[in-house]
UniProtKB/Swiss-Prot annotation:
Presence of keyword Nucleus: no
Cofactor: pyridoxal 5'-phosphate
Keywords for this protein: Isomerase, Pyridoxal phosphate
Pathway(s) it belongs to: Amino-acid biosynthesis; D-alanine biosynthesis; D-alanine from L-alanine: step 1/1
Catalytic activity: L-alanine = D-alanine
GO biological process terms, semicolon-separated: D-alanine biosynthetic process; peptidoglycan biosynthetic process
Protein name: Alanine racemase
Residue(s) carrying N6-(pyridoxal phosphate)lysine: 40
List of residues binding substrate: 136, 310
């Protein structure tokens, strides 16, 4: 999707806030624990290369979802370790070796395909994934995991790490988390030997279960100033949101009582009023279920009226504002604020889905 640089709709990214958040986390984690920044999905919509470049000197490595995201970082000049968290196609192994990118091994079936490929494995570095209860990818028992380690080592592959992922570390009820932790520790205890890097802590674990941190952590949503639990658990220390979503009024009109607004005529003015139009819609990530939510204009909350269109939304204004008046979708205006968590609660989802859904059509503008 082409970035629309000539519209007033922009995602403003405060890189210094991300830097601050990482330093806050580091201050509350053991000094000898490696800190890996999770920058998958374009750094949760914040811009992978820009974010990674800015924080490169305060993290030990980066985590991404796939080979293309990893190559984007390499092409952007990042040379620290990169771990692909997902399962990669066998065909990308040469690319991973060539670009010093670490792959995840999650099953013996994948390893069978790797061995059958007859590819050169010299220089390949891997981490093994344990499914301790998340239910997506990974080894579920000690025996196949140990077999994978043995076969990889015989093939000359460097087994650098082993990891798992917690499903409920961001919830008030820690029972499922404790089950997963016990499962992971039990499997580790049965292995013949452990690789150098053991990691299980995501953002939520790093915040609320610091006593379970091993020797590396994967820091994702929290570095962008997003509470992993939404509003369920209180953050133990100050974190700054890094992204604001803004635009401007491009059209203002006065309508009479009984006038309809938008597709389906779902909004009818109950009295004479001012309606403002803003060039941002569901193609930009502001989904149709946001009808009835507010935007901020001149420090006031203005409701979205009528259906959200692909490229535009309409809002009810308290007075007639001039064209070019700033509009805030996520961020602050005067004493009012709207957070990604507020948006998520309206949608019935999570705050990091909100920022990930801001499409490439919206330019990212960087501060600091």
């Amino acid at each position: 999707m082409k970035t629309s640089i000539h519209r007033p709709s922009q995602a403003l990214v405060d890189l210094s806030a991300i830097h601050f958040n990482i330093e806050q986390l580091k201050a509350h984690l053991p000094q000898d624990v490696e800190k890996w920044a999770v920058v998958k999905a374009n750094a949760y919509g914040h811009g992978a290369v820009a974010v990674s470049s800015y924080i490169d000197d305060i993290v030990d490595g980066f985590c991404v979802s796939n080979i293309d995201e990893a190559l984007e970082l390499r092409e952007g000049g990042l040379d620290k370790k990169i771990l692909i968290l997902g399962v990669s196609a066998i065909e990308v192994v040469p690319l991973a070796i060539q670009n010093k990118i670490t792959l995840t091994v999650a099953s013996l079936e994948w390893l069978d395909l790797l061995e059958a490929s007859s590819l050169s494995l010299q220089g390949l570095v891997v981490h093994l994934k344990v499914d301790s209860g998340m239910g997506r990818i990974g080894f579920r028992d000690r025996q196949p995991l140990q077999e994978a380690i043995n076969r990889l080592q015989v093939a000359g592959v460097q087994v650098e790490g082993i990891f798992t992922h917690f499903a409920t570390a961001d919830e008030a009820d820690a029972s499922k988390f404790e089950e997963q932790l016990a499962c992971f520790k039990g499997i580790l205890a049965e292995l013949d030997a452990l690789p150098p890097i053991i990691h299980a802590s995501n953002s939520a674990t790093s915040l609320w279960h610091t006593d379970t941190v091993m020797n590396a952590v994967r820091l994702g949503d929290i570095i962008y100033g997003l509470n992993p639990s939404g509003s369920v658990l209180e953050l133990p220390y100050d974190i700054k949101p890094a992204l604001s979503l803004v635009s401007e009024l491009v059209h203002v009109k006065e309508v009479e009582a009984g006038a309809d607004v938008g597709y389906g005529a779902t909004y009818t003015a109950d009295e004479g009023q001012f309606i403002g139009t803003i060039p941002l819609g569901y193609a930009d990530g502001w989904t149709r279920d946001m009808q009835g939510f507010d935007v901020l204009i001149d420090g006031q909350r203005c409701p979205i009226v009528g259906r959200i269109s692909m490229d535009q939304i309409t809002v009810r204004l308290p007075e007639k504002y001039p064209l070019g008046t700033p509009v805030v979708f996520i961020g602050k205006s005067g004493t009012e604020s709207i957070s990604a968590t507020d948006v998520a609660e309206k949608r019935g989802t999570i705050n990091y889905e909100v920022v990930c859904l801001i499409s490439d059509r919206v330019p990212r503008i960087y501060k600091n």
